[in-house]
Swiss-Prot record:
Gene Ontology cellular component terms for the protein in this record: mitochondrial matrix
InterPro entries the UniProt entry points to: Arg_biosynth_ArgJ, ArgJ-like_dom_sf, ArgJ_beta_C
Binding site for substrate: T201, K230, T241, E328, N468, T473
Pfam families per record: ArgJ
Name of the protein in question: Arginine biosynthesis bifunctional protein ArgJ, mitochondrial
Site annotation Cleavage: residues: A240, T241
Note: This protein may be expected to contain an N-terminal transit peptide but none has been predicted.
Amino acid sequence: MRNPKSFCVVAGFVRLPKSSLGQARYYSIPNDVSIPASKRKFIPSSGTYPKGFLVAGAHAGVKESNTQFPDVALICSETPCSAAAVFTTNKFQAAPVQVSKQVLEKRQGTGIRGVVINSGCANAVTGKGGLEDAKMMSAKVDECNGTPSTGPQDTSTLVMSTGVIGQRLPIKKILDAIPTAHSNLASTHSTWLATARAICTTDTFPKLLSRTFTLPSSPNRQYCLAGMTKGAGMIHPNMATLLGILCTDVPISPSALKALLTHAVSRSFNAISIDGDTSTNDTIALLANGAAGGEAIITTSSPDYAAMQTILTSFAQSLAQLVVRDGEGATKFITVRVCNSPSHADAKVIASTIARSPLVKTALYGKDANWGRILCAIGYAQGIAEGTVVPERTSVSFRPVDGSAELKLLVNGEPEAVDEERAARILQDEDLEIVVDLGGGQKGEKGLGGEEGLYWFCDFSHEYVTINGDYRT
């Protein structure tokens, strides 16, 4: 989400010498040609999608500069769903966030028919008029579904928007596009992929995943999970410029669904960072229509719940990681793993602090094994329990992607003699893992725990500054 006045279409950035993977950014993705070659490997060539869900995109022209490409998306279920969502913690919550919260609260997470999304305008900080626009979008989808609402407070469709902050939606264009999208609803892979494209802004590729699985109570029954997300900048925990829609055909109660989503998001979408900014619109929604049948997941104590929690969390992590891989100007994908912590929460705080550090991010862009910056970030992490970080027990290393031995940088608070040539080779790779061991490898020692926290982030490049300097903020 970007701030007021105009949306700047950025094209044709000059390639900077040190940036090998960053790409020019456009308002939306027009066709396959515009997708960078290095990113095409992340786009699925096929998929299996949950029963009873239909999707489509349509062109509304939310931005005047967009004369042909889809910028309105629909995800609809043929039957009412259980639904849960996690929203931005930003105090200036956009109109679609407020309306979606109202829909879920009014219906207590049941009877939801789908989601409508527009890209190009955030409908944030737009007052009562913006709220009415979001409600009209929800009501229009209900009308197309043949279940018109009895009033603006009784809709069954969630609403999401992404784009420029402080501008009103061209609501007539969007309301005209919704029936067009609805008439094209389908369940093919190409339609899912096109719908994922329709929600993009500065993304360089559409982010879509799907998978099949079974559950303990129905080992011979195939279930499906699909998800799409968008985001490339203003990404930081507790939701940033990030939209995500996950759908499954497993029957799940609203309370169990909420618990599943909360657990998964805390370990996925709330464990990524690109630039540390938290925005106004961000929403991750999970819909379950039960179309595949089988025993419903009602409580959090069942074997099916435990299995679904593992499946959903892993899936959400994979989806969230695609956002980091598309970070604005990014040349690296970094995993930071903090282990041997007394608590998962403290491990995650430390990992988050490292991921947010501009000095760490710029050092990695420069291929500099400057472990002092990592150590500094560990040392100033806020809100962790006393005794979590003990300098004499702390170790830091780089874990290469080729499976070779870790490059130890710091062991039990003492610096290692770093092989700079090997460090340079490791830092040439796109992927890197930083391991922070708070127990000096002494897992189980009194006062230490075995808890772990993971975080995913990217580096800061010259191109990040170029993109955001040219994009009205």
